[in-house]
Amino acid sequence: MSLILNILREMLEYFGVPVEQVLLIWENKDYGSTRSIVRIIGKMLPLEPCRRPNFELIPLLNSVDSDNCGSMVPSFADILYVANDEEASYLRFRNSIWKNEEEKVEIFHPLRLVRDPLSPAVRQKETVKNDLPVNEAAIRKIAALENELTFLRSQIAAIVEMQELKNSTNSSSFGLSDERISLGQLSSSRAAHLSVDPDQLPGSVLSPPPPPPLPPQFSSLQPPCFPPVQPGSNNICDSDNPATEMSKQNPAANKTNYSHHSKSQRNKDIPNMLDVLKDMNKVKLRAIERSPGGRPIHKRKRQNSHWDPVSLISHALKQKFAFQEDDSFEKENRSWESSPFSSPETSRFGHHISQSEGQRTKEEMVNTKAVDQGISNTSLLNSRI
């Protein structure tokens, strides 16, 4: 025991604690800074004190703010909930709505301590307040999208209605055509009994002037000319009077015909959404070959060299068959300078051979030169191999 006391005294002397103060520890009460040696040593050492936690009450939670109150990690703010909870602790979380919350907040409101401006709860509330304008902007965007959706629905309904009107106008147009045929027959029967003097016709009904004569090279293509219609003939009278009678007798029919024509023209200008959206589900994508890594495989085109015998022979044969199949009238005036195998052009005068035969002989010479050159190239390649 004496050894332990000596060790304690040496330790106290080392830290600078007087022995008289140690003796007073046993006589004092069990609270304060003198109740243990550890507290006394900690008081003597130049240590920075730790920040003390500040307990505060969380305000009333409702259904709107419950999702924005932070994480599920427990903290010192959950102590009052645990102490005052009447139900099982495993059935409740911090973000849930508690029973009798208003009564609890009114009871613990006067006991609320001073808030630390750097506490996590205050920072959490500030972030929630900062998020409010973002939520309002999102609500405005959703409202704008809903308005646009209603506008699109109204447009689709209008398009469907116009399609139905178009079908109805088509059916009515068939009925009007039948009525016109019957009226035309009646007017033709009436016109057979009418006769009009040539002096009573207006001056606007005159024969058109004759067309100018065509040049002699196109005279064979000119259609046969018909004699001009006399202004006093009965045919014009018969054709004009029924039209005037029909316009006088049926003005309402003409107006309805014009209105139906304008409506059908408008319906043709507007595209039909039903036809556009009809084949949306039938779209099929083309299968693309991919490598094991997932990249699409692109087929490389074969680059034919200029001295490849196969390409030379195929080019010569193409020229030959193209020359045989081409029967245009410009074939005689075509020059041979574009061909890479052509010989220098000589004068075409003084030859007894016709022009077509000369062209054929030149083409055969070009083809034979190309074939000979291709065979020589293949022999060179085989000798090198």
Swiss-Prot record:
May play a role in mitochondrial aerobic respiration essentially in the testis. Can also promote mitochondrial fission. It is found in: Mitochondrion. PANTHER family: MITOCHONDRIAL FISSION REGULATOR 2, PROTEIN OF UNKNOWN FUNCTION DUF729. Keywords: Acetylation, Mitochondrion, Phosphoprotein. Residues 231-257, 336-346 have a biased composition (Polar residues). It comes from Homo sapiens (Human). GO terms for cellular component: mitochondrion. Residues 207-216 have a biased composition (Pro residues). This is Mitochondrial fission regulator 2. The modification N-acetylserine is found at residue 2. The modification Phosphoserine is found at residues 119, 291, 328. Coiled coil: none annotated. Belongs to the MTFR1 family. One of its GO terms (biological process) is aerobic respiration. Residues 195-268, 331-363 are annotated as: Disordered.
